[in-house]
């Protein structure tokens, strides 16, 4: 047993059966996951025993040690978990990777405030209103307010009057001493409007329209009329879900097949203006998962706390209140409960859709390999291994192999090869070498053999591979070749002793699968070749610099990875990784010659 596994096993025996938080660390001592538990020992043992889903399996495979912190209660564990996630931002805590950022309208906290549309919420810098369903909706609302209120527009106060002053859309605080009470009144009216109180602004515009009409200024009266209609259109676009205009978020969730879907409805001005959907693989009870989610939703993501948060009645209200500093409502009946139920129903529908898509995807890939086997006259190729070479005029030649199982990439079984015995650009011999090395090892280690081998190339490549398999290794595995057209796209599948074209329709699932395989093996091979060339070029440059031996060369490669990064580095950067000052100066000079 490897040392780290022994250490983990021994440490598990001393973990207490108490509530607390735990931190999983990788080989670099980086925190990769933070979790909480009612009983730490049971939760931590569960990671290292039994079967897991793919995500948890990947996580466990990277764990080299763990730490834990005992707390006095489950509530304290939840609060500590949120703080630890904020501190370390572990990559396996998926909620931190929320890339959904919604637009808000912001009134800045300045002497003469401005109106902005932003996706970034920074507490203490102003008032935020939203979220809006999309940027267009937020921009249209801002444009409307810009036309009605002569609010400051410039980012920095200029030293002279700008265009907005001359067209009546700014009071010119950059030059004139604008009455702050007048500005405060505008801010109040804008705030009321953005909070859903449009009666005040409509009444004001109607009065201005009548005044303009009585003064025979019909052009100005028409402008006010258009603004009134625009406001009415803007506020009536969405179905009214409630006459109560309290700003609230409504949460509902559903659980199935080890997954949890949480739906959030953003209710603003009586309208549902946005919906947020999050899928989470269950790693604790559904209630615990929800408490973690809602705490992160408001503390770690770009979401403004509403006046009310509505949640299902089966949850612990006090637990939620400990991490969400606003009014928590658990409606028992009526329209508000209907909204929570609707959010839960939508979550269930989203989960069902997810599983249906997975099922369809599996059906398509199985159909593709069955069709491929039928057209080639072989058994269904459950396991396919494909090879491609990459080099430039025989320099740094490499090869790569990708594996597809049940029509899907099996990336843990991808392999890279540096060509060892072939001199110069000889694609056929390179392919023979790699196939020989691959399947010699497969036989020696008792690894699974593929049902089909695909090479990127034609008859010459196929014959070379078949010769190695049959005459050197005694294997009888079907070998096919994939050819590309003049646009470098997958064109034909070749198979058989005379490398005949297999009749596949270009719109068939089988052909689509072959296209994916060829693209993937080419991508994998060429990426490896670029990495190899980069390292070779880097080594050759470093070889000519005094004071840089093999150990320092390795250190530089690990620390910077490329010449470009080294050229961007300072003397201090080199010294910080352990390069002596005189060598660092020499290195810096040579790189900038």
Curated annotation (Swiss-Prot):
SMART domains: GIYc. GO terms for cellular component: cytoplasm; excinuclease repair complex. It is found in: Cytoplasm. GO terms for biological process: nucleotide-excision repair; SOS response. InterPro entries: GIY-YIG_endonuc, GIY-YIG_endonuc_sf, GIY-YIG_UvrC_Cho, RuvA_2-like, UVR_dom, UVR_dom_sf, UvrABC_protein_C, UvrC. The UvrABC repair system catalyzes the recognition and processing of DNA lesions. UvrC both incises the 5' and 3' sides of the lesion. The N-terminal half is responsible for the 3' incision and the C-terminal half is responsible for the 5' incision. Belongs to the UvrC family. This is UvrABC system protein C. It comes from Staphylococcus aureus (strain MRSA252). The gene is uvrC.
């Amino acid at each position: 047993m490897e040392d780290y596994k022994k250490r983990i096993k021994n440490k598990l025996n001393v973990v207490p059966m108490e509530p607390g938080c735990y931190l999983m660390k990788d080989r670099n001592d980086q925190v990769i996951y933070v979790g909480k538990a009612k009983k730490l020992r049971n939760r931590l043992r569960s990671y290292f025993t039994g079967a897991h889903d793919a995500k948890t399996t990947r996580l466990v495979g990277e764990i080299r040690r763990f730490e834990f912190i005992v707390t006095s209660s489950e509530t304290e564990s939840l609060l500590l978990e949120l703080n630890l996630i904020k501190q370390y931002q572990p990559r396996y805590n998926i909620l931190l990777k929320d890339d959904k950022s919604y637009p808000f309208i912001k009134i800045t906290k300045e002497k003469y405030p401005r109106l902005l549309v932003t996706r970034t919420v920074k507490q203490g810098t102003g008032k935020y209103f939203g979220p809006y369903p999309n940027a267009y909706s937020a921009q249209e609302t801002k444009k409307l307010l810009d036309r009605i209120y002569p609010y400051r527009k410039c980012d920095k106060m200029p030293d002279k009057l700008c265009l907005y002053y001359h067209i009546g859309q700014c009071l010119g605080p950059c030059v004139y001493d604008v009455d702050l009470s007048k500005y405060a009144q505008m801010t109040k009216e804008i705030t009321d409007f953005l909070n859903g109180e449009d009666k005040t602004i409509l009444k004001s515009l109607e009065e201005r329209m009548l005044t303009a009409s009585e003064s025979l200024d019909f052009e100005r009266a028409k402008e006010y009329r258009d603004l009134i209609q625009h406001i009415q259109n803007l506020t009536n676009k969405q179905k009214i879900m409630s006459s109560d205009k309290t700003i609230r978020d409504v949460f509902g969730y559903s659980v199935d097949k080890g997954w949890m879907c949480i739906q959030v409805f953003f209710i603003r001005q009586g309208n549902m203006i946005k919906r947020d959907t999050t899928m989470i693989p269950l790693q604790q009870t559904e209630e615990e998962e929800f408490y973690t989610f809602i705490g992160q939703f408001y503390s770690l993501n770009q979401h403004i706390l509403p006046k009310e948060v509505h949640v299902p009645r089966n949850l612990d209200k006090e637990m939620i209140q400990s991490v969400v500093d606003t009014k928590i409502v658990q409606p028992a009946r009526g329209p508000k409960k209907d909204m929570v139920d609707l959010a839960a129903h939508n979550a269930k529908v989203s989960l069902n859709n997810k599983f249906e898509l997975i099922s369809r995807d599996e059906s398509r890939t199985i159909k593709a390999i069955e069709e491929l086997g039928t057209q080639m006259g072989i058994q269904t190729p459950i396991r396919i291994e494909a090879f491609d070479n990459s080099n430039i005029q025989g320099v740094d030649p490499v090869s790569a192999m990708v594996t597809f199982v049940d029509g899907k990439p099996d990336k843990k079984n991808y392999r890279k090869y540096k060509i060892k015995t072939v001199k110069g650009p000889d694609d056929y011999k390179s392919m023979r070498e790699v196939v020989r090395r691959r399947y010699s090892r497969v036989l020696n280690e008792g690894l699974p053999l593929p049902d089909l081998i695909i090479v990127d190339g034609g008859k010459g490549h196929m014959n070379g591979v078949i010769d190695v398999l049959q005459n050197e290794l005694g294997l009888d595995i079907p070998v096919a070749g994939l050819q590309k057209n003049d646009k470098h796209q997958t064109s034909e599948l070749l198979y058989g002793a005379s490398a005949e074209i297999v009749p596949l329709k270009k719109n068939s699932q089988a052909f689509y699968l072959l296209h994916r395989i060829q693209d993937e093996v080419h991508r994998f091979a060429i990426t490896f070749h670029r990495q190899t060339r980069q390292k070779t070029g880097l080594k050759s440059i470093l070889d000519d610099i005094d004071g840089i031996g093999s150990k320092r060369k390795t250190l530089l490669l690990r620390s910077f990875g490329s010449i470009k990064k080294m050229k961007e580095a300072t003397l201090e950067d080199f010294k910080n990784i352990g390069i002596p000052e005189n060598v660092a100066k020499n290195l810096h000079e040579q790189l900038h010659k």
